Amino acid sequence: MKDCKPTYTPLQHNLKLTPVQPGETPIPEMTIDRKRVSYLTIIGSLMYAMLGTRLDLAFAVGLLSCFSAAPTSAHWEAAKRTLRYLQATKDMELVYDGSDVAIDMDFHGYSDADWSSDLDTSRSTSGYIFISNRAAISWASKRQSMVALSSTESEYIGLSITGQHIQWLRTFFDEIGQSQSGPTELNCNNQAAIILCKDPQFRARTKHIQWERQ
């Protein structure tokens, strides 16, 4: 796809993908650049890039991988768009700030979640990213294991998952001799979820929430 038309977003805005429907025929392989390529091969290649340096592919890879068992033409078109995005942005890189004499190894994080984005199960997707020295050091995008009844609940579950990863990161930094100088800053754009975190009392709208353990 060297000569493909460039695109600058991994997926189409508000893209909604569904599993193979009755009467549809799955397409496990397709010819790209005169080569037979399997859908699983494309997902594996995208995942390899995402786990290494391309955090911007996390959501797209998570979504596309849900249809690996029986991909249809719609899933292929979405996957090829992600490849076009990767081709257009292949010069992007992570750059860590090492200009200071004493490098600050403290990290901070961001947590976000949508609500009921899975058309088949009504489950939400949450994600997080952690920054140190002005670049990302850890990231993830994952479908939640339970159905959230509101956007606040979805964000709250996402914060729980992110909080568990903070604890793991702090332990890791301790082991390499880079203990954090204070509490880890975690940012979220849902005010109701923030209030719930600050005052986690049982309420009628939240007492049913179960914690996700990673």
Q: What residue ranges belong to the model's regions?
A:
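Long, low-complexity, charge-biased intrinsically disordered regions
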Residues: 1-214
